[in-house]
A protein has these predicted regions:
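N-terminal active-site wall of soluble small-molecule enzyme domains
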Residues: 95-105
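Domain-level recognition of nuclease-like catalytic cores that cleave nucleotide substrates
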Residues: 146-206
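Hydrophobic beta-strand segments of well-ordered beta-sheets in folded domains
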Residues: 112, 131-138, 158-163
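Conserved catalytic cores of phosphodiester-cleaving nucleases, focusing on short active-site segments
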Residues: 101-103, 110-124
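A short acidic, amphipathic alpha-helical/loop segment
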Residues: 123-127, 149-150
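Acidic-basic catalytic patches of nuclease active cores, encompassing PD-(D/E)XK
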Residues: 41-93
Length: 209
């Protein structure tokens, strides 16, 4: 017969194992978006029915930055692929080898690879070898520190563009997140206005590279 102390230790161990398994088994949360894009800068107007899978470790802020990045670059579906391509979200945090957003032409070639956040230089270099163009959107308060530490390592990557989304704007984007969203995106003079009919967020990204 187990002593009271041994029984309690076994109970704690069982609880820890169960909690760990439950955490590992957490599934991505699915978000549905109807995104109406009016890109005045590039004369691109289209509705996109999108599905976002938010990884358990991904914040609403990061997820909405992915959505904003797609809106900024949706016109390339027409300009780069003549409408015959696939603009879609990748596995994101579920697979570090997969882009957050990508544009693939009808041959399966990656025309555009988009990452958000503050990745290391090696994954960025790999992305530049896999796609014609790579766009990186950073948004956190620590972005300036990250950029100072990585800028010189990215200088040689001609296919790469790096954009800084103001943190206040990215935080405001998070408040638009709903499991089902009807959003309007207007792009003019390089800026994005994203709204749901009640609230609108203005995004004026700054190009760092």
């Amino acid at each position: 017969m187990l002593s009271a102390g041994a029984a309690w230790q076994r109970k704690l161990a069982t609880f820890w194992i169960t909690t760990t398994i439950d955490t590992m088994a957490l599934k991505s949360t699915i978000f549905k978006v109807n995104l109406q894009i009016a890109d005045i800068d590039h004369n691109y107007y289209a509705d996109h029915a999108l599905t976002l899978a938010r990884h358990p470790s991904e914040t609403d802020e990061r997820m909405m930055i992915r959505l904003a990045a797609l809106a900024f670059n949706a016109y390339k579906l027409q300009s780069e692929c003549n409408g015959d391509g696939v603009l879609a979200f990748g596995a994101g945090l579920s697979d570090v080898e997969d882009p957050d957003v990508s544009l693939t032409d009808f041959t399966g070639h990656k025309r555009l690879w988009i990452e958000v956040g503050q990745p290391e230089d090696k994954p960025i270099s790999k992305a530049c070898n896999k796609a014609d163009a790579v766009m990186l959107y950073c948004f956190a308060h620590s972005s300036e520190i990250w950029w100072k530490g990585i800028e010189t390592k990215l200088t040689r990557l001609d296919r790469l563009q790096v954009w800084r989304v103001p943190t206040l704007a990215s935080q405001a984007l998070a408040k638009l997140a709903q499991r089902s969203m009807q959003l309007q995106a207007t792009i003019q003079e390089g800026n994005l206005m994203l709204g749901d009919g009640k609230d609108t967020v203005d995004i004026e990204p700054i190009r760092w590279k």
